[in-house]
Regions:
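Hydrophobic alpha-helical segments
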Residues: 346, 410, 449-543
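C-terminal motif of bacterial Sec signal peptides marking the signal peptidase cleavage site
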Residues: 28-31
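N-terminal secretory signal peptides that target proteins for export/translocation
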Residues: 1-13
Length: 771
């Protein structure tokens, strides 16, 4: 880039300034008026001509009302260059933050508040993953990544004195983008889909502050699965009593909460499906993807919309800003979506440590082994650099080590899948031109670095394939940290990809992925024990089973009034076993003034229609009942826990199958009922009484969507897209917060010249070579 612009590279270290607290990330720009005039210039106009060094001939960018860009060029070089320029103009702050996060360098931008997170990311060492991924990428794709990077850098150079406000207010000068940075972001994306690290650390913290007997009740696997009592009992008692490890566990949990808040590539939960021509009322195949809102509504969604058009490449869909491939989209012949499979290919091991003659050692196979060491330098905004050692055991990097001045104790090591010859980046690139389900199915089997549900559809066929790499575990489910010195819980290589779940053109006519459990207990491959709440998947299956499916099924509708699976499960719980008798006994214990009201509320709940939409009043009462259960069931125990544990437990309940719902659906013998209200029946009646006061105005849409992609092969313009949050992360952009009339509206993303002009009109931003 020095040769391209004739300038020295940006400094690796920001100027010294006061440390910027974490709250800056979520703050508004009030108080930053000094930056406003220049920062506002960081927004690229929608029309006009921009001359840039690096573009060969010309390219055009057009945007619809939601800011979804159409990028047109007569050649692939300028298309990729302009894609880099466009994504940087929309998402530079996100791209820079994610690169620094993956590198373990956020303290350079935000100060000492990020130092613990930087330590964690340096230990995990995603930079090595990115380098390996890039090394295994074909030379032609490496050149494409370099072209894309030059487009990013053209924006960086153009706006070098008028960067977006969050970067401008810290005087941070981002380094130029490198081709390897795209591989680094894909490595961060892969890591974010690959395990339950935060859940395992949460489990250890809960066991340390409560006890191992309560732990399985708080971290259930699935409604029909037994609690992981045996796994919890494998955590050694002496480990739980170690105060130094307890303190370091809390610190690590706090850091992981920080990671979750900052990592926009932590894939959102999503509901997706493909339907065959025989299944749909239109008589054509279709693909639908609805990602759920993971970020606050005012923040942009994790993915960025793109519509690419050149003689060599036509594709439209969702992309990670910084990586010139699609995570979901349509290339003119093939539609595909990649969503979270809730994989668990990471495990935490408790290592027994000691300091011996100036070196750190860990216990393995009844012998003390030296820990591997490497040195890392951390640059901190406003402070002097620090240089620290990072240690690893045979399992992997130590995320916590011995306390200062301690000669022995425990640490936590992270083991995760390591792939030396992975070509996942090339697989994603090849999907952009794959012409059929048959060819794409063969291709995605090589997607080893990215664990995912991949759904495929062409005009005649549909398919589903699970991807990734999964360890074979001895005597463990990977739910809770295991003692590293115990060889009986070690990994034994990786699962055979032949065991990965897949299907093609099933007789039922549809395939779906909604983060649900994909394999039954006892299956020869352990994908995970950390599935999401099955409600979305079960409700979708109920709808898809009704043939033929109308096109309206794919629309991003409010589902808060249609909850057939949950209502059925709760009504069965209330009507089976000893629950009816227990409820009658609990009713008799209520004061007479409440007894009639509780009886009426119970009967109203039993009368809720599972197969029909709820009224506004019914939906509000159901939501109130669920919210009351969630808030009160574990309140006594949670209130006594450190804030970091409470926050982590709340995050876990949002992302995975939650304990409060598991208790409502069953677990009548749980000790938590006694703590909460004396009995489950009494707790349910109290919750019914509370919900009976709910107003119909209190009902809120469930779930909250983030982005929706619809591909209907029966339509002249197959692709439609909707955004529920902004396309840009620049607060001065008109596309950072979408107007109400635009939010959730479906916009076509055409791929032919005739349709393009109809949809986008003739206004363009034209990119030309500099004079």
């Amino acid at each position: 880039m020095r040769q391209l612009f004739g300038l020295p590279p940006f400094s690796l270290r920001p100027p010294h300034a006061a440390a910027l607290l974490l709250s800056v990330l979520a703050a508004t720009l009030s108080g930053c008026q000094l930056f406003e005039p220049r920062a506002a210039q960081s927004v690229v106009p929608d029309t006009g001509v921009v001359r840039l060094q690096g573009i060969a001939q010309s390219a055009h960018i057009a945007k619809n009302a939601a800011g979804m860009p159409l990028i047109e060029s007569g050649n692939l070089h300028d298309l990729l260059f302009t894609l880099g320029y466009s994504q940087a103009s929309d998402r530079l702050t996100q791209m820079v933050q994610l690169r620094l996060l993956a590198q373990g360098r956020l303290a350079e931008l935000y100060g000492a508040e990020m130092l613990d997170l930087d330590r964690l990311m340096r230990a995990i060492n995603l930079s090595a993953d990115g380098q390996n991924l890039y090394k295994n990428t074909p030379k032609n794709l490496q050149s494409y990544l370099a072209i894309y990077a030059r487009g990013v850098n053209a924006y960086l150079y153009q706006m070098r004195n008028t960067l977006p406000p969050e970067l401008a207010q810290t005087n941070f000068k981002p380094e130029y983008w490198q081709a390897e940075d795209s591989a680094l972001l894909l490595s961060l994306f892969s890591f974010s889909q690959s395990g339950n690290l935060a859940e395992e650390i949460l489990a250890l913290a809960l066991a340390q502050h409560l006890d191992t007997e309560q732990l399985p009740w708080l971290l259930p696997v699935y409604p029909d699965e037994a609690l992981a009592v045996a796994d919890a009992q494998k955590i050694p008692a002496q480990v739980l009593r170690n105060s130094a490890l307890s303190n370091s566990t809390l610190q690590l949990l706090d850091t992981l909460n920080q990671f979750s808040a900052l990592n926009t590539l932590q894939a959102p939960l999503a509901t997706s499906w493909v339907s065959s021509p025989q299944q749909n009322l239109t008589g054509a195949s279709s693909l639908t993807l609805h990602s759920l809102q993971a970020q606050p509504q005012h923040k942009p969604a994790p993915y960025s919309w793109v519509n690419l058009h050149s003689p060599q490449l036509q594709a439209a869909g969702l992309s990670i800003a910084g990586v010139p491939v699609l995570i979901a989209g349509f290339n003119g012949q093939l539609a595909y979506s990649i969503s979270a499979v809730m994989a668990d290919s990471q495990d935490v091991f408790i290592e027994q440590l000691r300091q011996q003659q100036g070196r750190l050692e860990y216990l393995a196979n009844d012998q003390w082994q030296p820990a591997q060491q490497r040195m890392e330098t951390f640059f901190i905004r406003g402070q002097r650099p620090v240089r620290e050692a990072i240690y690893s055991t045979a399992h992997g990097p130590l995320l916590t080590s011995l306390a200062p001045n301690s000669s022995s104790g425990y640490g936590l090591a992270l083991q995760r899948t390591q792939l030396d010859a992975d070509r996942s980046l090339n697989v994603l690139w090849q999907l952009l031109s794959s012409a059929s389900v048959e060819k794409a199915s063969e291709l995605v089997q090589e997607l080893r670095a990215l664990p995912a549900n991949v759904l495929l559809a062409d005009a005649k066929h549909i398919a589903w394939q699970v991807t990734g790499s999964y360890p074979n575990r001895r005597n463990s489910r990977g739910l809770f940290p295991a003692p590293g010195w115990d060889a009986t819980v070690a990994w034994e290589g990786y699962a055979d990809p032949m065991l990965y779940p897949y299907d093609q053109d099933p007789a039922q006519g549809w395939l779906s992925a909604a983060n649900q459990r994909l394999t039954q207990p006892g299956y020869g491959l352990q994908l995970s024990s950390s599935w999401a709440n099955p409600e979305r998947a079960e409700n979708l299956a109920i709808q898809l089973t009704k043939k033929p499916n109308p096109a309206s099924l794919a629309l991003p509708n409010d589902t808060s009034r249609q909850r057939p699976w949950l209502i059925t499960q709760l009504q069965q719980m209330l009507s089976s076993g000893g629950m009816p008798t227990a409820l009658q006994q609990a009713l008799q214990k209520l004061p007479s003034a409440q007894r009639s009201q509780a009886q009426q509320a119970l009967q109203g709940f039993l009368a809720l229609p599972a197969d029909q939409p709820l009224s506004a009043q019914q939906a509000a009462q159901l939501q109130s009942f669920l919210a009351q259960a969630q808030a009160q069931l574990f309140s006594t125990e949670l209130q006594s826990l450190p804030t970091s544990v409470q926050q982590a437990f709340s995050l876990h309940s949002q992302h995975s199958y939650p304990a409060w719902l598991d208790h409502l659906l069953g677990r009548d013998d749980s000790p938590f009922w006694q703590h909460a209200c004396g009995s489950k029946a009494q707790f349910l009646l109290n919750s019914f009484l509370h919900s009976s006061q709910a107003s119909s105005q209190a009902a809120t849409p469930q779930p909250s969507y983030s982005q929706s992609l619809l591909v209907d092969f029966s339509q002249a313009v197959p692709v439609s897209a909707a955004s529920f949050s902004g396309q840009s992360d620049n607060p001065y952009s008109p596309y950072q917060q979408l107007p109400k009339a635009v939010t959730g509206k479906l916009y076509p993303l055409p791929n032919t010249h005739t349709d393009i002009e109809k949809v986008y009109g003739k206004q363009r931003l034209t990119l030309l070579p500099s004079k």
